Amino acid sequence: MFATRLVVVLLSFVILTRCQYQYTIGAANTPFQTGLHHLASYNTTPNTMGGGQGIRTVAYFVNWAIYARNHTPQDLPADSLTHVLYSFANVRPESGEVYLTDPWSDTDKHFDGDSWNDPGTNVYGCIKQLFKLKQRNRNFKILLSIGGWTYSSNFANPASTVTGRQTFARTAVQLLEDLGFDGIDIDWEYPQNDAQASDYVQLLQEVRRQLDQAEQKRRSRVHFLLTVACPAGAQNYQKLRIAEMDRYLDFWNLMAYDYAGSWDQIAGHQSNWYADPNNNAATPFSTDAALKSYLGHGVRNNKMIIGVPLYGRAFMGTKGPGSSFNGVGDGSWENGVWDYKSLPKSECQVQNDAKLIASWCYNPSAGTMISYDTPEMVSMKAGLVNQYGFGGGMWWESSADKPFGQQSLIETFLHSCGGQHRLEQQSNCLEYPESKYDNIRNLNC
């Protein structure tokens, strides 16, 4: 009897060590299913922590967060993030000019400690606060994110002409130099045909060219980053010229969420890693399938950043994943969408499916399901980032997380990857001699 138990214990230790999964099971959680056969599914050579470069932790900060959400740059866990994507700048469809969308939030608002009597021309708002975080945390970098779902219809026209692409790149880089960004993130959702996919490649090429020129103006060695938010749905990523795009990109932020929602007829998982062969309706998309496509087009593992939602999508009047539903109900800021910090809802049973790496909470009396990532599932996703050397994690968006020490998903992911010492080490830039703002240009660095 003792020998049998010893074999079981040793076997369990070997399996868990191989998987590098770290998780804790709360009282509200159901027992995990096992899906270890998935671990051999990638036809790639596993790397170690992003190819030896460390992991990237990337969070979107939205410029409207300072209003009803009461979330400011000062709330960001800057010592635990390598990159923040400041969202969103827009594009003028007639010219390609990139411009800020909320001057009050972006550059004008005076936060506590900001003087009204500073001499010269100075930037304030979220931009100044983020720059101060850069000064205190030299591994913390800020990228200007352009586009997003609301503004993406403005890309196609300027991207289709040489002049439009040049204007886009020039004005984006000008904002970078004026405001002290470390790079540009482009979120075009989505090119609709091969012509637009080709235009996208040429747009990235032009932005990369002008970023390279901006780098040469610096006394110290610096590399300005170029990244994209990329789709996880086959109907969108199959249109992209992935291999051609990849040569200009530092990394890809995979939007591994919104796999199911109010637009569907069936309640499903919104951020599952694997598809469910026994319940196809519940998993119309999967992170696994998307990653295989990008890797199959030559993208290195360590350039793929795995998106993690800091929110849940609700379905009313349903029996659960794979069943019909009737409406989505209320939400934190929009119907059917709940901030992670508001989850799980009361009287909901939390379900973790380790076979799919998917989780949800369900209220059987009300027939309400909310698909969201629990700390247990995020820890398992971090385990796969470790196992296969993916580049790190990305979160939409920072205001919705729980505080560190209270089941924060950002903290959970980082801890499961090995902690802060596993972060990629790449210094930010503090040298912007061409900035029109005195408090950016005249910084002693």
What is the role of each PLM region?
Residues 3-19:
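Cleavable N-terminal signal peptides of Sec/SRP-targeted secreted and luminal proteins
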Residues 21-176, 408-411, 415-444:
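Glycan-recognition patch characteristic of GH18 chitinases/ENGases
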Residues 53-55, 80-82, 138-142, 180-182, ...:
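Short, well-ordered coil/turn segments that N-cap beta-strands
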Residues 58-59, 95-121, 189-345:
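Substrate-binding surface in catalytic domains of secreted glycosidases
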Residues 63-78, 160-178, 234-245, 287-291, ...:
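Short, acidic/polar
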Residues 84, 144, 186, 207, ...:
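Conserved, mostly hydrophobic/aromatic
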Residues 147, 184-189:
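Mobile, glycine-rich extracellular loop/lid and propeptide segments
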Residues 331-390:
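Hydrophobic, secondary-structure "cap" segments at the distal end of domains
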